[in-house]
């Protein structure tokens, strides 16, 4: 059947629009393999912005802590962020610190993943434990620190051993792996105890609950607990080391920034910088 001129132009026009639309969609998802660049490049975005957006803790002394007097963040993970910023932006560590080439945002175990996913942050350096499950969603660097879980109690609690946790309420942080690790420890040590768990949005809230008697214990990584160990508190059976936590820097899954971050951490391990930092911040 012959096609009129109007019909021909309509069909041809639709075809052109269709091809153009497909090309545009392809550009959103990826770039040409041969181009060596991408509109989705995290490294390029950071260089254009001139700063690295970092998710850190504000309440863990030695790792990520916001000094309320100076209004500045300090700790091993803060220094590590500046090292990564220096590597990405092609400047020295000293220059990165002096020019404040990191933009810090407080994160919690519940918020850190989503902030990476929606590109509000470039990296997370916030005592973020590497697990097989988490590696399905985010990229992690080589571990820069290994810690263990501890259980903080009041000295007058009457508890002297892990078995005394039976029926007690343990405060843990939302989105952390602590609950599972405590239960695994009780099973591994063949300790007959069934505690309850209560989740809190942040560490200060758990400590406040412990002080108020709303929970009987505060379980978390030992380095974190060190921040909250006051004169009237102590670790329950500190000789039981469990729940080894390997901390890594998290980045968006599959992004080009991941390699730079991992290479930087490996270099800092090799040249002894990380060991010096651990000593500097009293994390031995």
What kind of region is each of these model predictions?
Residues 40, 47-123:
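Extracytoplasmic small-molecule ligand-binding "clamshell" domains
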